[in-house]
């Protein structure tokens, strides 16, 4: 674990959820560039009632919020906002590890900030749709003239960032690069200047689904989900408990409800906007169904056991590509099934999930496959299922 040295002190940060033999750092130079910028311009948080209020967007592991908290008289001078449950949980866990107050002010998307900020620092999100939506959100919730600083690593920055800032904020420019990171600056216009296309609508089966900004499959249902829809359980017993794990817009769980009206489906996602998309879609088309919605790290925090868990695992975690998220969700599913229950998984053929699944389940069978995807049915968790691989 590499110490994070910032203008007001030092933090020991870990990525969350914790995993053994972690090789990825919990901060980068874009975080440090934002903090250095505030310090160089005399915008560090100070003591007293006149300390500036700072709004932080898209803090990845708590590096920004916690560094500012070390400079602040109170954690209440800092408010964080973002779409990711795991990012918010990372900030809390790292706060505890560093002896800081974990009770940071937090506002989820679609909500207004709890306090009027004097300055904003923002990590540029991976999703262009989420970037557009957040820039418009800032234009509608900030007083005119509030300084806004954005940063990201050069290799991840969208080329259209400055034009998007100018469209939604009315101004914006790129600053100097530093250690493969780049800073951008703007001022809040004090009013909404342009509309976004979000939430958008996507046609799936006989439904027209709400899809909020940043949620996977913005324009149309992805090909993996379309293949999975043809291989879902259709004869579940009355009251069967089903989890749509990593539900996105909710289409998989909704298809289960269509075929099994008496099923009880729990929609799970770590994205607040994904879960809001699913909630909106289920309430529109299945208002009488017994449905539940869980914002969290997969199934963590749920005591319920399921007859069937459905999973189309992501192999991107932000800018990181790998199977570590899938492994964690497989581990959770293996301990969350009732006796005789099943995990049904779809994955890209080249990812070789069957090898990992065979270490967690005594029975792993192929239900369907095509040139690109495989659908597996997994039953009978192995004795080692309670010992995570990661």
From Swiss-Prot:
Q: Sorted alphabetically, which SUPFAM superfamilies does this protein's record hold?
A: S-adenosyl-L-methionine-dependent methyltransferases (SSF53335)
UniProt superkingdom = Bacteria
Q: Does the keyword Cytoplasm apply?
A: yes
Record EC number:
2.1.1.174
Q: Offer an example of a GO molecular function term for this protein.
A: 23S rRNA (guanine(1835)-N(2))-methyltransferase activity
Source species, please? Alcanivorax borkumensis (strain ATCC 700651 / DSM 11573 / NCIMB 13689 / SK2)
InterPro entries per the UniProt record, alphabetical: DNA_methylase_N6_adenine_CS (IPR002052), rRNA_m2G-MeTrfase_RlmG (IPR017237), RsmC/RlmG (IPR046977), SAM-dependent_MTases_sf (IPR029063), Small_mtfrase_dom (IPR007848)
Record-given protein name: Ribosomal RNA large subunit methyltransferase G
**What protein family does this chain belong to?**
Belongs to the methyltransferase superfamily. RlmG family.
Q: Which UniProt keywords apply?
A: Cytoplasm, Methyltransferase, rRNA processing, S-adenosyl-L-methionine, Transferase
Please name the PANTHER family in this protein's record. RIBOSOMAL RNA LARGE SUBUNIT METHYLTRANSFERASE G, RIBOSOMAL RNA SMALL SUBUNIT METHYLTRANSFERASE C
